[in-house]
């Protein structure tokens, strides 16, 4: 028999801190619940248990508190966000059939110990899942600890058996108790012996075997292992050491059920579990727990519905008229060998009244550009693509529920129709077995429209997000022409550069087998063999991340390693990556993502053209291979310092506004104000510092981050920041008010009314709260800039169409728009870009663009 025992409080704690704060649409925290259930699934897969017990601590004091008043006295209060989720975790575990174990006056650790001892007595295997290293003392031939850890921002489980404990700590599992009795434990406030730290404690136990062994040699002054001062402390604190041993020993006699079969997984209440998971918007977990076929229990807060009529299924009329709701049943994906393939394609359908019309491709085309039809759809992007591929525009599409869902909750990772129906509690007007979402479409869309109006986001939706979907579909359709032969030659050059750098690296390391892609080999070479400074140890060995290597760039080997990494990324990501996605027409048709970024910004993939490097000469050279077709040029318009101009507008700061209005260099002007210098005395270094502060303020950077950016001490950076805020008090006042308002209402807004919820601001955890404050500062500025460029895209696209020009908007990257224009239209296209981009808003500081043109993107930028 195999028993899995989970330390419920410990795993919940790991889950809470391992995942960023998640909330449901109505503001309930779910990150610990989501994380706990994910960890549970991993544990079940890893241990394959026959029985599962979940141990929880109770609030009442334990025998250890009675033994020592200071026990756990320094523990911080559990964050409210976690405390609210624990009862739900316990409820879900019960509904899924898992048995909870508690014992008044005892800790969860003792429950783990007692069940482990019971398994050992039966020669059964026991797996203890916990994030608490105290449980390692329980490891034995029959007991394995599955230790939940977090490293490099990722959670994982480390399997600790007897050999693993000995290898890591140099002592046996039981000797860990002796070690703790000497060094104490700050988290549990176990005192230990004054002056004995971790290193000394391990050394003493490794030498003498136990606490008793240490004291047996205490009077042997000829033994130099124990230093004189340590000997003195050991003698003085013997009672504390023995108390610490008792406090640190996990008991194995807790009054709980230890019988075989006591923790067999029961039936639970799967229907109620599914209902609760749906309520918590944990839809992905329903399938992972194998509950997809379970009908959820009725919502206790909603009155039982009358039996619903069945839908009528019909073929789409030859001449459809009126208003239809259009959506798709998602494609069914599955494994074919090791590949993920589409087992069943997405299937579109239309709803009118109580009639459902399955739609073939020709049916869709009869609806999408039909003057007698209007369509409310869910996910317009593929529909616009179909219409445009057939020579139309998708002009019948009047509203998109997916875009509405994004505006109403930008924090969601995806927008699934079935899940939204549950989240909005949309009522079905009829049932339809083949198209199960069809009956609730009308109520879902109505509720979304009502909510958008209530949140005053109608203008944002109607003027920006909805029309932008058509623009993006057209841009994807057109694509951008690339010089394939040029990219291939660039790739040959890259590979040659890579070989040259690798040869230098091998010469510098003295090893032809040295692999610069191996973090282990690189760390050992830099910090063990060469003894370079700034080394940081992680659980996996020496850190060799970009920040660590940048601090060592002055060393020739490190400079070559960084060069090697840069060339390698250029070659694999951009050269080889771009060559794979060139279509038959010689163009790259990147896909724009409208519903991903919480700030409202666009992203792109397949390929991601937002990240084409521009800071290095070789990186920027890639842009030369994005070209205009014969007889055309690329016209490139880029906003100049749009975020700083928005900052000047929203803060009302006269100094900042004046600098922009008079055409001064804003960073030079800022430096002059901060340092009290005439403009002509501002050095490049001071300007660079001011530039870093200007942007750092918006992104919520503190003195430490700023010091890294401008290469000064933290103290100097702190002085710069204080000087800046004193010089521009309205900026400081605006930031403070933004955070205060966000705390009060739970969100921030752009100037266009786009909302971003910030549950992080309510956290008791300082780091989480600080992250929320940074987002509160940044989102209104960055989000407004995103809204502005989206609006400009819509206006530019419409102008080019309305004026019947051949010029086409083909690409956007951050604050930049690119039009492919016939040479004869280039000047007019440039004028339209400038007029629409600068004229789409009326702010206290006018927006400014820089417009250039060329045969390729590098020339035009």
Which residues does each PLM region occupy?
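Conserved RNase H-like, two-metal-ion catalytic cores of nucleic-acid enzymes
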Residues: 3-4, 8, 14-53, 69-70, ...
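Charged catalytic and DNA/RNA-contacting regions of genome-maintenance
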Residues: 126-129, 136-174, 344-347, 352, ...
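Function-dense linear segments that define catalytic or interfacial modules
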Residues: 353, 402-431, 438-441, 594-678
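Active-site palm subdomain of RNA-directed nucleic acid polymerases
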Residues: 452-464, 468, 788, 792-813, ...
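Conserved catalytic core of nucleic-acid polymerases
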Residues: 477, 589-590, 594-597, 672-805, ...
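C-terminal polymerase-core module
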Residues: 496-503, 507, 511-558, 726-774, ...
């Amino acid at each position: 028999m195999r028993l899995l025992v989970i330390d419920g409080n410990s795993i919940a704690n790991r889950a809470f801190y391992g995942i960023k704060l998640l909330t449901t649409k109505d503001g309930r925290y779910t990150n610990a619940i989501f994380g706990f259930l994910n960890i549970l699934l991993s544990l079940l897969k890893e241990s394959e248990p026959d029985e599962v017990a979940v141990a929880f601590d109770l609030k009442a004091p334990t025998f250890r508190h009675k033994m020592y008043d200071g026990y756990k006295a320094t523990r911080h209060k559990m964050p409210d966000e976690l405390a609210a989720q624990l009862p739900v975790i316990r409820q879900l575990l019960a509904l899924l059939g898992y048995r909870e174990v508690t014992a008044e006056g005892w800790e969860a650790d003792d429950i783990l110990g007692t069940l482990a001892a019971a398994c050992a007595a039966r020669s059964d295997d026991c797996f203890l899942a916990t994030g608490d290293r105290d449980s390692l003392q329980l490891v034995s031939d029959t007991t394995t600890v599955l230790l939940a850890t977090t490293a490099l921002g990722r959670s994982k489980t480390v399997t600790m058996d007897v050999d693993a404990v000995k290898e890591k700590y140099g002592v046996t599992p039981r000797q860990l108790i002796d070690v703790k009795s000497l060094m104490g434990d700050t988290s549990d406030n176990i005192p230990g012996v004054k002056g004995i730290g971790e290193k000394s404690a391990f050394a003493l136990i490794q030498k003498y075997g136990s606490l008793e062994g240490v004291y047996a040699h205490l009077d042997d002054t000829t033994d130099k292992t124990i230093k004189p001062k340590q000997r003195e402390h050991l003698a003085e604190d013997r009672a504390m050491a023995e108390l610490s041993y008792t406090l640190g020993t996990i008991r194995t006699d807790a009054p709980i059920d230890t019988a075989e079969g006591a923790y067999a997984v029961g039936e639970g209440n799967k229907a109620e579990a599914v209902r609760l998971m749906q309520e918590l918007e944990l839809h992905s977990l329903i399938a992972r727990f194998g509950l997809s076929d379970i009908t959820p229990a009725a919502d206790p807060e909603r009155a039982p519905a009358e039996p619903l009529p069945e839908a009528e299924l019909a073929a789409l009329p030859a001449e459809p008229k009126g208003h239809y709701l259009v959506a798709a049943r998602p494609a069914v994906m599955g494994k074919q060998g090791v590949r993920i393939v589409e087992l069943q394609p997405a299937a579109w359908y239309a709803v009118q009244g109580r009639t459902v019309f399955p739609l073939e491709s020709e049916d869709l085309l009869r609806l999408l550009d039909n003057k007698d039809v209007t369509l409310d759809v869910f996910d317009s992007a593929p529909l616009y693509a179909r219409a445009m591929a057939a020579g139309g525009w998708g002009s019948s599409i009047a509203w998109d529920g997916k875009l509405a869902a994004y505006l109403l909750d930008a924090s969601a990772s995806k927008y699934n129709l079935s899940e939204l129906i549950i989240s909005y509690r949309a009522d079905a007007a009829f049932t339809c077995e083949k198209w199960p979402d069809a009956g609730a479409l009308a109520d879902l869309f109505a509720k979304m429209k009502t909510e958008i109006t209530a949140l005053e986001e109608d203008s944002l939706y109607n003027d920006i997000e909805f029309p932008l979907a058509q623009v993006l579909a057209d841009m994807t359709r057109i694509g951008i022409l690339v010089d394939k032969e040029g990219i291939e030659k660039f790739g040959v050059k890259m590979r040659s550069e890579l070989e040259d750098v690798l040869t230098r690296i091998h010469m510098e390391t003295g090893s032809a087998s040295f692999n610069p892609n191996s973090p282990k080999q690189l760390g050992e070479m830099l910090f063990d063999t060469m003894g370079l400074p700034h080394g940081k140890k992680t659980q996996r060995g020496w850190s060799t991340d970009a920040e660590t290597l940048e601090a060592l760039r002055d060393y020739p080997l490190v400079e070559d390693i960084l060069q090697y990494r840069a060339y390698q990324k250029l070659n694999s990501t951009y050269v080889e990556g771009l060559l794979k996605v060139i279509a038959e027409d010689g163009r790259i048709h990147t896909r724009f993502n409208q519903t991903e970024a919480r700030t409202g910004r666009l992203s792109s993939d397949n390929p991601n053209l937002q990240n084409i490097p521009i800071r290095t000469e070789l990186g920027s050279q890639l842009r030369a291979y994005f070209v205009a077709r014969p007889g055309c040029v690329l016209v490139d318009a880029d906003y100049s310092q749009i975020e700083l101009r928005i900052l000047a507008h929203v803060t009302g700061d006269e100094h900042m506004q004046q600098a922009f209005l008079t055409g001064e260099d804003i960073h030079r002007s800022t430096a002059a104000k901060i340092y009290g210098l005439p403009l002509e005395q501002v050095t490049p270094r001071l300007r660079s510092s001011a530039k870093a502060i200007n942007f750092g303020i918006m992104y919520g950077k503190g003195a430490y981050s700023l010091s890294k950016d401008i290469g000064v001490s933290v103290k100097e950076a702190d002085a710069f920041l204080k000087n800046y805020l004193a010089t521009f008090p309205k900026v400081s006042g605006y930031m403070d008010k933004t955070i205060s308002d966000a705390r009060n209402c739970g969100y921030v807004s752009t100037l266009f009314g786009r909302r971003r919820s910030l549950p992080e601001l309510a956290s008791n955890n300082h780091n989480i709260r600080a992250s929320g404050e940074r987002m509160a500062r940044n989102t209104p500025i960055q989000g407004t800039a995103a809204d502005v460029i989206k609006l400009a895209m819509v206006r530019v696209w419409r102008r080019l169409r309305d004026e019947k020009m051949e010029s086409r908007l083909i690409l956007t990257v951050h604050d930049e728009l690119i039009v492919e224009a016939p040479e004869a239209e280039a000047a007019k296209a440039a004028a339209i870009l400038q007029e629409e981009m600068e004229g789409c808003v009326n702010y206290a500081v006018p927006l400014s663009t820089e417009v250039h043109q060329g045969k390729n993107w590098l020339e035009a930028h």
